[in-house]
Each structure stands twice: as C-alpha cells, then as structure tokens.
UniProtKB/Swiss-Prot annotation:
Keywords: Glycosidase, Hydrolase, Plant defense, Signal. May provide a degree of protection against microbial invasion of germinated barley grain through its ability to degrade fungal cell wall polysaccharides. It comes from the Eukaryota. Belongs to the glycosyl hydrolase 17 family. The keyword Signal applies. Residues 1-25 form the signal peptide. The active site is at E117 (proton donor), E255 (nucleophile). Its EC number is 3.2.1.39. The keyword Calcium does not apply. GO terms for molecular function: glucan endo-1,3-beta-D-glucosidase activity. This is Glucan endo-1,3-beta-glucosidase GIII.
C-alpha cells in the first residue's frame, strides 16, 4: 500500500510538470470522425514531422494519449460525453481526472475543455458545474491544468465594427462562466471562422480580407486598423469581454480553418491562403491585444463521417492517407 501511494504521488508530480509545456502560437485539431483515418501513433508521428507542437482532441482516447506520451506536444482535451456526470458529481469528476489525466503522466496537458459549442439550454446549464468539479478535481490531484469551455462565435453580437462587440447570450449562461474564468486567470476558448462570415456575406466581405491576402480592404475602428477579418472577429470578442466586466480573460482560438472543397469559396487555394496566413499571423496577436494569440487550426484530416454539409468533411490539412490536401508550412 505504501509503495502504491508513492507511485501515485510520483505520477501526479509528473502530470504537473508535463502540464507546463512551452507556449506556442499554433496547434491543429485532431478529429476522428472518419472510417479511414491513420492510427494514432502515425498521427502523432506526422505532427512531430511537421513540427506541430499542440493538438486538440475532442474526448479522452487512450490510444491517442498513449501515443502523445513523452512527445512534448501540448494537448487541449475536451471531456467528451461525460458532461452530465461531471456536472452532477464531484466524485465522478475526480474519477474522470484519475482515469484520463493522472493515468497519463507523460502527456503535456494544457487545457481541459468542458465540451465544444454546447447550444441547448439544458446542456449549457451543466457547463459551469462541470467546470468547477473538474477544476477542483485537478487541484486535488496537484495539477495546474486549466479548465475552460469552447464557444461558437455567435455567442457574441454586434461584432462589426469590432469595438461594438457584446455578449449575445440571451439565456445568461456565459456571464457566470466568464466570472469563473477570470478568477484565477483561465482562458475562454472560442471557435472563430472567417470562412462562414465570408460565405454568408460575400457581397460586403472581400475574399482577400477573409483569407489574410493583402488587398484594398481595411477597417478603421477606435484608432485601430484591421487588414483581415480574423483580427476583427477576435477583437470583437475582447470588446464583448470588456463590456461583460471580464477584461482580463484571455482568448484562445480553439478552432479556425477553411474548407478546401464542396462549398462556396471552398478551394484548396483559398484554404491554403487562409491557413498559411493564420500560421504566419497569430504570433503577432491582434490590433487590440499584442502578443502571440494561441490558435488551433481545424483540422488535421478530412473526416468522411462528419455531420452536416459536405464541406464539413473537407477542412483537413491532410488527406486520410496523410498526403497534404495542399502545401502548408509550420
């Protein structure tokens, strides 16, 4: 029993150390909604060969976590389908942390996301209790990993010009979450897709402005100049956070990308322009917030079992056989 206690203590120390990976600006989301995707070990090898040093995964998966162990790749991990039990039971949260975090001391966990884009009111009501329970379980395990949740961009409103941004949260679920994130400092994870803004309004949004290609479009707002849509969207989030009384909450872009096929403006040329532009850009921050803006490209692979329009299956930087969908450099 004493030996077991020592082993557990050592494992928790290793998790704590692994939870402090060097902060880098760009990662890639590793979705698994496909029946032809490569094995986790091959995926991790591809990340390393391309010098991609951060990965988002959408639920704990032991084969993926085992492949990540010892690589130094920083991990943003969603809790997956465990949300109801995590919200209702501190003991379930403790068991979840033990099974999915403490059991993988060689994995460089950076954040735990309590679900992704939860839009139904019943689900939204469980997010904050689950965040609290998971954060307490991590703290009890001696882990400094931060807990957050990933939101869609449309939880913000009046986003043009950026300084007009406000919360569009009619149910009020987001404001208490922001207060939780603010003390102590934890980031808000936000999914930001200029592609969908461009697709919805190509008359008023120039393609060059949406894809980081230098063009004639600039937006001037409160003394700040915007040369791309991504920055404008990000700074509208920061404006909304200020108006909500939580100006110190950092934003992490938990998804952003551009499809290469099967939709309006969805070409390999546009996808490459956007994603390469994003990679090159985020180290500089935005006009409102200088400094690196941590961001995750969606996604690593085209996923043939994704729900929704066909374009949803074509966001990958790579094909399932691991050949590039188009040229990209990290």
């Amino acid at each position: 029993m004493a030996r077991k206690g020592v082993d557990v203590a050592v494992a928790l120390v290793l998790v704590a150390l692994a939870a402090f990976p060097a902060v880098h600006s760009i990662g890639v989301c590793n979705g698994v909604l496909g029946n032809n995707l490569p094995a986790p070990s091959d995926v991790v090898t591809l990340y390393r060969s391309k010098r991609i040093d951060a990965m988002r995964i959408y639920e704990p998966e032991s084969k993926v976590l085992t492949a990540l162990s010892g690589t130094g790749i920083a991990v943003l991990m969603d809790v997956g389908p465990a949300l109801p039990s995590l919200a209702s039971s501190p003991s379930a949260a403790a068991a979840w942390v033990k099974a999915n975090v403490s059991s993988f001391p060689g994995v460089s966990f950076r954040y735990i996301a309590v679900r992704n884009e939860v839009m139904d009111s019943a689900g939204q009501s469980t997010i904050l209790p689950a965040m609290r329970n998971v954060q307490r379980a991590l703290a009890a395990a001696g882990s400094p990993i931060k807990v957050s949740t990933s939101v869609r961009f449309d939880v913000f409103n009046n986003t043009s010009p950026p300084s007009n941004g406000v919360l569009a949260d009619k149910s009020g679920f987001l404001r208490p979450i922001l207060n939780f994130l603010a003390r102590p400092a934890r980031p808000l994870l936000a999914n930001v897709y200029p592609y969908f803004a461009y697709k919805g309004n190509p008359r008023d949004i120039q393609l060059t402005f949406a894809t980081f290609v230098p063009g004639s479009t600039t937006v001037n707002d409160n003394g700040l100049t915007y040369t791309n849509l991504f920055d404008a969207m990000v700074d509208s989030i920061y404006a909304a956070l200020e108006k909500a009384g939580t100006p110190g909450v950092k934003v992490v872009i938990s998804e952003s990308g551009w499809p290469s096929d099967q939709g309006f403006g969805a070409t390999a040329q546009n996808a490459r322009a956007y994603n390469q532009g994003l990679i090159n850009h985020v180290g500089n921050g935005s006009p409102k917030k200088a400094g690196a803006l941590e961001s995750y490209i969606f996604a690593m692979f085209n996923e043939n079992l994704k729900d929704g329009d066909e374009l949803e299956k074509n966001f990958g930087l790579f094909k399932p056989n691991m050949s590039p969908a188009y040229a990209i450099t990290f």
